[in-house]
Regions:
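C-terminal beta-signal and adjacent terminal beta-strands/loops
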Residues: 120-123, 174-183, 207-277
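Membrane-embedded beta-barrel scaffold of Gram-negative outer-membrane proteins
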Residues: 11-13, 21-23, 48-107, 230, ...
Length: 277
């Protein structure tokens, strides 16, 4: 296969520090062995490479706010996919149709702002929008297994004003729900439910013992360390139940199948020690 791609960058001679990027191309993805097996387990050697025509527009904007450095990165993209080999997802098992009988598209936007909201610490905010659908045998568009509409995340770092050796961070994540998948080899057009939205908050506290190493006398036991710190973290601090996939269970009486969510880890407490010589 031949996959021509190109990228162009433009940096105008403006007072503002902005870089524009344009990239695109035609990409082929040859099938692997698993993508050649149909629902009976038979290998279909005539499955073709899936292809994608994509276009990406981006910009990097560096600026100063409160006399501190910040950067805003933005990207918008569109992909048109042909000869798609559709697949279904059950729990962690991916089943391919072994047939290039679908077309698809993906479009989205990624935004990220990072900088020193607090002097000497890096924080960032990010937002993503994604829409990806596929059309199998001209039956109409349905959501692809990766169709997660919105993603929003914040990582904010700070330190205690009177004790700068004590650093804290807060990580917040909110994602809209993914498609819930479908039983193996079932018609995905029948199973178009979604998982619950993903919500998570993490917090961490770190005490850096080597913060004042430059002013310490020679021979002090901490002088031999470039970094020596210990901390305490709480992951998923509000104990949210976040599902990642469904396991499908059949009712023997009605013959219906029901999705049982597979949940990720709930609240976790973590102690950490970091040493660098």
């Amino acid at each position: 296969v031949f996959s021509p791609r190109a990228q162009f960058s433009l940096k105008p001679e403006w007072e503002k520090d902005i870089l524009f990027r344009v990239s695109g191309g035609y990409y082929y993805q040859p099938p692997f062995y698993r993508e050649l097996r149909d629902k009976t387990g038979t290998v279909q050697p005539n499955v073709k490479a899936q292809s994608s025509l994509h276009l990406v527009l981006g910009s990097d904007y560096s600026f100063k706010l409160w006399d501190r450095p910040f950067k805003m990165v933005a990207e918008a993209y569109y992909k048109s996919l042909t000869d798609v080999n559709p697949y279904t997802l059950e729990n962690v098992r991916i089943r391919y149709a072994a047939n290039n009988n679908a077309t698809a598209f993906a479009q989205g936007l990624d935004l990220r702002l990072n900088g020193e909201f607090v002097p000497g610490t890096e924080s960032w905010f990010s937002f993503s929008y994604l829409k990806t659908k596929e059309n199998t045998d001209n039956r109409g568009d349905i959501a692809r297994p990766t169709d997660q509409r919105f993603k929003f995340a914040i990582l904010f770092q700070d330190y205690m004003p009177n004790i700068p050796s004590v650093k804290i961070y807060l990580n917040l994540v909110y994602n809209t729900g993914l498609p819930g998948g479908s039983p193996s080899y079932a018609d995905p057009y029948v199973y178009q439910s979604r998982l619950r939205d993903y919500r998570r908050a993490d917090a961490g506290f770190t005490y850096v013992l080597t913060e004042k190493n430059a002013s310490r006398r020679e021979g002090h036991w901490l002088k031999k360390f470039k970094e020596f710190s210990f901390g305490f973290e709480i992951f998923n601090m509000f104990n949210n139940q976040n599902a990642i996939t469904n396991t499908w269970v059949r009712d023997v009486y009605t013959k219906n199948q029901y999705g049982i969510p597979n949940y990720l880890t709930t609240r976790v407490f973590n102690l950490k020690l970091s040493v660098r010589l």
